[in-house]
Each structure stands twice: as structure tokens, then as C-alpha cells.
Amino acid sequence: MGKKAIQFGGGNIGRGFVAEFLHEAGYEVVFVDVMDKIIDALTSNPSYQVTEVSDEGERTKTITNYSAINSKTHESEVVQEIATADVVTCAVGPNILKFIAPVIAKGIDARTASKPLAVIACENAIGATDTLHGFIKQNTDESRLSTMGERAQFANSAIDRIVPNQPAGEGLNVRIEKFYEWVVEKTPFGSVGHPDIPAIHWVDHLEPYIERKLFTVNTGHATTAYYGYQRGKKMIAEALADPEIRQIVHQVLEETASLIVAKHEISEEEQKEYVNTIISRISNPYLEDNVERVGRAPLRKLSRKERFIGPAAQLAEKGMKYDALLGSVEMALRFQNVPGDEESVELAKILNEMSADDATAKLTGLEKSHPLYQPVQNVVAKVQKGGK
């Protein structure tokens, strides 16, 4: 029997990051999605191409040995596949984890294999696999919870690879940044051992990697997008070519760097090098990435553990500087009524209908007693008044 992986989410990250490396590791990949269009395309095409883009040029890989199932219409087939798989991964967005948990719970419960299933959520969120695990437990019979560890092991991961807007008419093919980082904690697998996926960097402690990535790549990328959007820039590379925006992004990342260095065993020099690499990556004009794609979903990006409030709250607790991050928060709050982005419409509604206090609590999840609450509330009030 060959190795088999179930990948929830047949979108660009699912096809162009996760499945690429599962395929290279020798896994048969079963895509699970609820979008008929994606399932039909995967079912009717025996291969697709992943093109890695860098300033050195392009490199194309062909992905084969996959199938696809619509979990909306063929749930029992998905359950059966999970029951006989080695690995389950997902790239569906943190808000969708609760919707995929019931079918994964059924699949885990149906397992009789001697080796536990490895479950790895590949989302831009801290502790995404823990979150998924929680939803799976809610969908599992209580009498089966104590033995779940025999059937499945859950490991958090940090993923980092930029997938820009795709050219029209490319179908399943994905253009993607050459650089990638996929870090997964190995401790949950214990004596059983982790799956054999060479692209993964297995570590004992994941938090430094997740925070470094989220508070550098995601914070920097989104800051560029929101400032760029306000200044009429179309592309991320174009925004970063503006010396003023580039300077602001550096200031924001100096603040998050001070947190990362203070908290984790990462030296100032190492973090500085990492920041420079990140800025050079997101400046890459070959990626042709636009500010609206990177800025979309501002409600999620403004939430408590995310890329702005997450580091700013920790800095405030430590009595450290977070002024530049407040600027990013302000620009994110101004990302309203953007065509095709429901969250930006909802954001405008919240800021229009709620008091500054209520809007701050709802958007950021900060408690009134938190040292960051009042500074953020001031920014919310300023945006509500239309001040620049």
C-alpha cells in the first residue's frame, strides 16, 4: 500500500504548497472541498503545474497522482479515505476549521489502522491544529475520546509561502513564490515518529517559529497592503517601492522584532536578517501580488491573536514601544467597502453603527483593563470621525 494524504481545501495554497510537497514525498493526495468547480477541475485533469517564481527565473513542476471528493455530496467516501489515510492536512482558512471537523471526526473514529493518523492544519493562525482538534473532540462520542490518541495525533504547524493572485485562465496551475517554510512540531508523535515529508522542518517547540513568521511576514505584508491601498498603489511591490511606505514597514517590523528577540531565543542579528529577507521577498515584482488580495479579511487580521493586536498587546504588557503597529491598525480600520471583500463591508458597518468602545471590543477582543485598549480605542474613534 502506498502512502496517502487527505488535503482539505483545493485552493491555491492546498494545490500549490501542501499538495506539491506531499506529492514530492511520495503520497497519493486526495483533495476534499465543497466547491463543485474545484472538484470538477481536479477530477477531469490528471495533472496540474506549480510554477515557482523568483528573481532567478521560473521553475515548473508537474503534480500527478491525486483525486478529489466533494464532502458536501460524498461525505461517506471522505470518511472512508480518512479511515485508511496516513496524513490529513488542511488549508481552508481558520474560520472554516469548525466545518471540516465533523467529517474528520467520523473518519478518525472509523480507523482501525495500527499507526495513528497525523493531522496537521496548515493555516495562518497560531495553534490552528489545536483549534481543529478541539472541534473534532466536540464531534466525537465521549466514550471514544480517551482512546482517540491511538487513532490520531495532532501537530501544530507554521507555514510561509506567498501565493499571489493568479493569472486568469490558468485553471488548476499555480504560480507561487520559490521561498517556503513549513515547520511542524514533532513532540505529539512521540515514539510512533512523525510522517516522512522531507519539505517539513520538524521542531520540538513551534511557538518561536509561528510568532516570528506571523509577526514578521504577515504583519509586514498586511502593513504594506493597507498603507499601499490608502495611497492608491495597486501592487505590493509598487507600494514597497515608495520610500515612505518602506520606512513605515521597517518601523513596524522593528517593533515586532523587539518582542521576538525579548521573548524567544532569537538574536537581534538573526531577526534583522530575517526581516530583510522578508522585505526583499514581498518586494518581489515577479510575484505580481496586489494590495487588495493581501489586505482582504480585515476583521480577521484585526482580531486578538492576529498580526497587529497580537504583538502590540504583548509589547504593551511589557511596557515596550508599539506606535508603528498602531499605525497599521489604523490603516486596517480604513480598509472599508472594498469590492469583493465581505469583511471590509462588515468593518464599515461596525464602525458606522457602534460606539468606539463597542467597536474596539468587538474588533480586537481586548479587555478594557488591557494597556493596549485605550490607545486602540483612540485610533478607532479617530477613524470613525474621519480624521486623517
Swiss-Prot record:
The keyword Oxidoreductase applies. InterPro entries: 6-PGluconate_DH-like_C_sf (IPR008927), 6PGD_dom2 (IPR013328), Mannitol_1_phos_5_DH (IPR023028), Mannitol_DH (IPR000669), Mannitol_DH_C (IPR013118), Mannitol_DH_N (IPR013131), NAD(P)-bd_dom_sf (IPR036291). It catalyses: D-mannitol 1-phosphate + NAD(+) = beta-D-fructose 6-phosphate + NADH + H(+). Keywords: NAD, Oxidoreductase. It comes from the Eukaryota. GO terms for biological process: mannitol catabolic process. It is an enzyme of class 1 (oxidoreductase). NAD(+) binds at residues 5-16. The keyword NAD applies. Its EC number is 1.1.1.17. SUPFAM superfamilies: 6-phosphogluconate dehydrogenase C-terminal domain-like, NAD(P)-binding Rossmann-fold domains. GO terms for molecular function: mannitol-1-phosphate 5-dehydrogenase activity. Belongs to the mannitol dehydrogenase family. Catalyzes the NAD(H)-dependent interconversion of D-fructose 6-phosphate and D-mannitol 1-phosphate in the mannitol metabolic pathway. Monomer. This is Mannitol-1-phosphate 5-dehydrogenase. It comes from Aspergillus clavatus (strain ATCC 1007 / CBS 513.65 / DSM 816 / NCTC 3887 / NRRL 1 / QM 1276 / 107). The gene is mpdA.
